[in-house]
A protein has these predicted regions:
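N-terminal subdomain of nucleotide-sugar transferases
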Residues: 1-57
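A donor-sugar binding/catalytic signature common to diverse glycosyltransferases
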Residues: 21, 306-355
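A nucleotide-sugar donor-handling region in carbohydrate enzymes
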Residues: 36, 175-259, 289-292
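Phosphate/nucleotide-donor binding subsite
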Residues: 54-123
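Conserved nucleotide-sugar donor-interacting segment of glycosyltransferase catalytic cores
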Residues: 94-182
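Donor-nucleotide binding loops and adjacent catalytic segments primarily
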Residues: 222-320
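C-terminal amphipathic helix plus adjacent low-complexity
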Residues: 377-420
Length: 420
């Protein structure tokens, strides 16, 4: 098969595509990754073949200009069932309007979509796998007749709320069923002589790495896939000190890569964080950029500062991990059975943190509730209470039972033959 993977230019979203891309390659299939120019270095670093499309989006810069009001729309993005009573029609309509205008249409610009369609016309993929917000892949598949599927990297909050929104619209008179996302995609497809249907936002099926207990079920056909840690965003080198067992419980502290390269700031001042961990009887490994390290005047004796360290090697040596709520860190800790304290502050990070706490595999602390005292208390719990390690082990077992990327390839071959 020829498989085209499309992803907008955010490295953390692309990282979740890499293990399956390589499983397809090692099974003998041709794989081509299309992304905006800013993504190409990450694609090449993964050893994959890249095709630049469109121009770089300016989503982060736009958010900085729009201001805190738009960010606040995401800040309480709690999609647990107990909160669905607040997700009424007007809220969902407003949310989709904002997301379409300020996110979906920005990371899927006309130039990007045109280039992906032209690429697909020339290369003729059998299957298009698209990151779930990169609708350019679905458009290209529709125009060229390829099979296509969403390659999820997070719980499917988008589709679950989309389904809820559509069910509310269906109860309205025909003249009041405004669907901003559908209208934008319909006008886009019309440029190529095609029209919109819901398959453009759902894919023909979805590939989902979320385990039971974290996964959000929808009406969409789904192929489960095991999460495989990938460290390709940073130098993946094991330092000498990591080859020796720690002398006391080790705590990993990581605030992720996205805050280093975008307008998403850290959720806690580094000085406050170090004040908390300095009082704990633990060895702390904190991953901070050189710029962040330079801003810290005093480093506690029990803290080791590093710029980069492969998490899938570090975390098995740790009693717990304190992190920002990002998908890669969360999933790596979950796959390795490490208890986690997540400082999630928006959208899927909040959901994952709360579900992990509900499973007993970790604790959640929303950034709006974050104080040194609360952080200190939760760290003491997650380090001292053995139940977190036990429940984290159960989450690891659930993830290990899912099919590996290699095991998923035959299913993709079958579905492509049926749908393409």
């Amino acid at each position: 098969m020829r498989v085209l993977i499309t992803c907008f230019a955010v490295d953390s979203h692309f990282s979740g595509c890499v293990p399956l891309a390589w499983a397809l390659r090692t099974a003998g299939h041709q794989v081509l990754v299309a992304g905006q120019p800013a993504l190409i270095e990450a694609v090449v670093r993964a050893g994959l073949t890249a095709a630049p499309v469109g121009v770089d989006h300016a989503h982060d810069q736009m958010l900085a200009k729009v201001g805190a009001d738009i960010l606040a729309l995401h800040d309480d993005r709690d999609y647990l069932e107990k909160r669905h009573d607040r997700l009424g029609l007007e809220f969902l309509r407003g949310h989709e309007t904002v997301m379409t205008a300020l996110f979906y249409s920005k990371v899927n610009s006309d130039s990007m979509i045109d280039d992906v369609v032209d690429l697909a016309y020339g290369w003729q993929p059998d299957l298009v796998l698209w990151e779930p917000f990169t609708f350019a892949g679905a458009v290209a598949a529709r125009v060229t007749g390829a099979a296509h599927a969403r390659l999820l990297t997070m719980p499917d909050m988008f589709l679950s709320t989309r389904e809820r929104h559509l069910s509310m619209l269906d109860r309205l008179p025909a003249g009041r069923r405004d669907d901003v996302l559908a209208s934008w995609l319909d006008s886009t497809l019309a440029r190529y002589g095609h029209g919109f249907d819901e398959e453009i936002v759902t894919g023909q099926w979805s590939i989902n790495p979320m385990p039971e207990g974290i996964r959000i079920d929808t009406r969409q056909p789904t192929v489960p896939i095991r999460y495989i840690p990938y460290n390709g965003q940073v130098p993946s080198i094991v330092p000498d000190w990591l080859r020796e067992p720690p002398g006391r419980p080790r705590l990993c502290v990581t605030l992720g890569m996205t805050a280093r390269t975008s307008n998403w700031s850290n959720m806690i001042a580094i000085e406050d964080l170090f004040e908390v961990v300095a009082e704990l009887n633990v060895e702390v490994v904190a991953t901070l950029s050189a710029e962040e390290q330079a801003l810290v005047p005093d480093v506690p004796d029990n803290v080791r500062l590093v710029e980069h360290v492969p998490l899938d090697v570090l975390l098995p040596t740790c009693a717990a991990v304190l992190h920002h709520g990002g998908l890669g860190t969360w999933a790596t800790a979950a796959a390795l059975g490490v208890p986690q304290l997540s400082l999630g502050y928006m959208w899927d990070a909040v959901y994952r943190a709360q579900r992990t706490e509900a499973l007993g595999a970790g604790l959640a602390l929303h950034s709006s509730d974050l104080t040194p005292a609360r952080l200190r208390g939760l760290l003491a719990r997650i380090l001292d209470e053995g139940s977190f390690r036990h429940r984290a082990g159960q989450l690891r077992e659930a993830m290990s039972a899912m099919p590996s990327p290699n095991d998923v390839v035959p299913m993709l071959e079958k579905l492509t033959a049926e749908r393409g």
